[in-house]
Regions:
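A cytosolic small-molecule/anion-sensing beta-strand core signal
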Residues: 29, 202, 210
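Short, flexible loop segments at the rims of nucleotide/cofactor-binding pockets, characterized by
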Residues: 3, 119-121, 184-187, 212
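Secondary-structure transition/capping motifs at alpha-helix termini
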Residues: 5-6, 134-140, 158-165, 198-202
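Conserved short alpha-helical segments that host acidic/polar catalytic motifs at enzyme active sites
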Residues: 1-76, 81-139, 145
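Flexible loop/turn segments at secondary-structure boundaries
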Residues: 34, 42-43, 63-64, 88-89, ...
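Active-site lining segments that contact anionic ligands and/or coordinate catalytic metals
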Residues: 22-23, 42, 76-77, 165, ...
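Extended, hydrophobic alpha-helical segments in both membrane/secreted and soluble proteins
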Residues: 142, 149-156, 160, 164, ...
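Short, glycine/charge-rich flexible loops or terminal/linker lids adjacent to PRPP-binding catalytic cores
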Residues: 161-207, 217
Length: 218
């Protein structure tokens, strides 16, 4: 099907109205930079500025790295058009219920990012503290599954008063294991990626904290 809209932004809106799902889209067309966040706001999209230059990124830490300032999050269903005249905002989609993905706070976003106005690192520590309040058992040490389980484990340790230690050592030269196509591949990669630290864990009662359990491989 071909859109009958006269301009690029109109055609883009026509195309996106056919999609019911999660996206944060950034594209360059003619002399414009266009950013669109899906109507449910499942994924974040952030506007930043460095001097006279406008930027769009999926995480605030990307703006920090290039010396830009975070201006604001795009609203669910918002389209930003950036051109030589500046920035203009449009809300071209029908308003629907927000469905922000909680996994941004749990796993997807970097700990040094701010998502929807809240720091990811502190959100993860708070989740760990809440877990300690709800489900604490007697233990000698709180151990994280590195690296993404570290903030939650710190929060758990602070809330419970049980010492935190590094009982699992991560090999940072092994790539992503979660996205391996087969279970055998994921299992083999985890064996290379993580190793128990006997000096820390031998003879100890351990509470092991991870950010989430999807397949249970780690």
């Amino acid at each position: 099907a071909r859109s009958h809209q006269a301009d690029v932004t109109g055609r883009l809106v026509d195309a996106l109205k056919q999609i019911d799902g999660a996206y944060s889209l950034v594209c360059v067309a003619d002399d414009m930079l266009i950013g669109v966040r899906d109507p449910h706001g499942v994924r974040p999209l952030i506007l930043g500025k460095r001097d006279d230059t406008w930027l769009l990124a999926s995480e605030s830490c990307a703006l920090d790295i290039v010396g830009a300032t975070v201006v604001r999050d795009l609203e669910p269903g918002e389209m930003l058009i950036i051109d030589k005249n500046g920035v203009r905002s449009e809300m071209p989609f029908q308003q629907v219920a927000p469905r922000f993905c909680v996994f941004e706070y749990v796993y997807f976003s970097r700990p040094d990012s701010i998502v929807e106005g809240r720091g990811v690192y502190h959100a993860r520590k708070a989740i760990g503290g809440e877990l300690a309040s709800e489900s604490h058992i007697d233990a000698d040490l709180i151990i994280p599954v590195p690296d993404s389980g570290v903030p939650a484990a710190l929060g758990y340790a602070e809330k419970s008063g049980v010492p935190f230690d590094l009982g699992i050592i991560r090999n940072h030269y092994v790539g992503r294991t979660f996205i391996q196509p087969t279970q055998k591949g994921r299992t083999d990669s985890v064996k290379l990626k993580h190793n128990a630290n006997p000096a820390a864990v031998k003879g100890k009662r351990i509470v092991l904290v991870d950010d989430s359990i999807v397949r249970g491989t780690t």
